């Protein structure tokens, strides 16, 4: 009896590939899983960018305060809704080589608009994080501001103003910097306290 034909048939049936319908079912399942997962992944990415921007802004203010206390000269952080953040430090009278000026530059006796009296030591534009929006509210007025100058003295005190034409005045209320995206429930707050300390809160 010749059994070669059935054996060959069984081998051929066992080694066959996927049918077109089976491949289409697999593709549909993968597409459904991707559709379910993508919104969650996108939300996580937005949250991560928001957190990173908020932490970097808070660190910028902390470093500015420490720089003022360490150098013995005033340091100002300027926020502008268009250009972002700039950190400026005062220069000693006579330039960088003068280590002992008669009157150390401070928040109030420095003309921050004159390049010869200041220099930019750091910049940060939140726009590098896709979709991140920044807003500033000063207390106790609660008014939104498109510009904010916050100056730290060598003793760590903080002076602020929201208009460049105004005089810098001692901080008496909280400054709230909102960092978020155009998505509900996705926002972080950078709070700068009257003592100059900065912290991040939900």
Outline where the language-model segments fall:
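N-terminal helix-rich module
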Residues: 2-10, 21-24, 32, 36-62, ...
